């Protein structure tokens, strides 16, 4: 069965990608599974300088998922290039660098450093814009356009723009990214959420709110992938609560070219193998010759 997909000329041997933030830089998981099983690995979020992240507690379990407010803890781009990237290049899989900036200039600088070293870059626009009162870049179509264009102007590899679901109309963000030259979009990022300890009356997350991931957000993610698929022609990487192959199939039918799996990696490190096998069995059972035939193939 042909599971190969292509995003802006980059061929992935299968459409299952390790999502940013749940896989670190692959070192821990490499002791449990062959991480070459993934079609690609999307790195933990990378910033220009080292970040220690937010204060603890910054992770809590809730019905149907996890709320996190890790705060982009990472060693910084220089340490990533010198220490983590050589390790990742030892595996037979594509590497996607997830970049995070707090100004347009930081996104541009990160792209200049990384675009010749990795297969693709995923631009996380859920960072606060420190020059404009902390508003999240990705909520404003004009900012999405501006940053995407600035990054594309200096990039030597394909650019994936990661979209936030915490907006009224995500398709408008997708359109802005496409107009600015994005090679693909990925969605959805986490959904803004909160949980409270009723005994202490304190939020379970030190920063009060965080991002919800896991199966609770899957129906939202599927809807948003479908809405974007109807509006743009560039490939969509779908994510949000994928726990098994059936969840993955929904995303392909809704219009995703590839998928990312995140929260499930915490629960089942072997999920990538099980999801791949399930997709293959489904395609054979339904008479498809390749995964590409399923993308956007919805009966309405």
Curated annotation (Swiss-Prot):
GO terms for biological process: 'de novo' pyrimidine nucleobase biosynthetic process; 'de novo' UMP biosynthetic process. Coiled coil: none annotated. It catalyses: (S)-dihydroorotate + NAD(+) = orotate + NADH + H(+). It is found in: Cytoplasm. One of its GO terms (cellular component) is cytoplasm. FMN binds at residues 20, 44-45, 98, 124, 162, 188, 214, 240-241, 262-263. Belongs to the dihydroorotate dehydrogenase family. Type 1 subfamily. This is Dihydroorotate dehydrogenase B (NAD(+)), catalytic subunit. It comes from Caldicellulosiruptor saccharolyticus (strain ATCC 43494 / DSM 8903 / Tp8T 6331).
């Amino acid at each position: 069965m042909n599971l190969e997909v292509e995003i802006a000329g980059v061929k992935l041997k299968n459409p299952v990608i390790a999502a940013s933030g749940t896989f670190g830089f692959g070192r821990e998981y490499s002791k449990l599974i062959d991480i070459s099983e993934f079609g690609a690995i999307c790195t933990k979020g990378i910033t220009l300088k080292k970040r220690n992240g937010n204060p603890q507690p910054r992770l809590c379990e809730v019905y149907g998922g996890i709320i996190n407010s890790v705060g982009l803890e990472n060693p910084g781009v220089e340490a990533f290039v010198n220490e983590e990237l050589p390790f990742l290049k030892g595996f037979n899989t594509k590497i996607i660098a997830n970049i995070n900036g707090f100004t347009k200039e930081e996104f541009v600088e990160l792209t200049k450093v990384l675009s010749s070293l990795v297969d693709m870059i995923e631009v996380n626009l859920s960072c606060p814009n420190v020059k404009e009162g902390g508003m999240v870049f990705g909520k404003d179509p004009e900012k999405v356009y501006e940053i995407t264009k600035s990054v594309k102007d200096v990039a030597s590899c394909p650019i994936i723009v990661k979209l936030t679901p915490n907006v009224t109309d995500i398709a408008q963000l997708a359109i802005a990214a496409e107009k600015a030259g994005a090679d693909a979009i990925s969605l959805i990022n986490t959904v803004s959420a909160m949980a409270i300890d009723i005994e202490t009356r304190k939020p379970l997350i030190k920063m009060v709110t965080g991002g919800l991931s896991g199966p609770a957000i899957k129906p939202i993610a599927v809807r948003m992938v479908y809405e974007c698929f109807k509006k743009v022609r560039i490939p969509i990487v779908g994510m949000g609560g994928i726990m098994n192959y059936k969840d993955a199939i929904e995303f392909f039918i809704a219009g995703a070219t590839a998928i990312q799996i995140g929260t499930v990696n915490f629960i089942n490190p072997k999920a990538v193998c099980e999801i791949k096998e399930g997709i293959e069995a489904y395609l054979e059972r339904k008479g498809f010759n390749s995964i590409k035939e399923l993308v956007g193939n919805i009966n309405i």
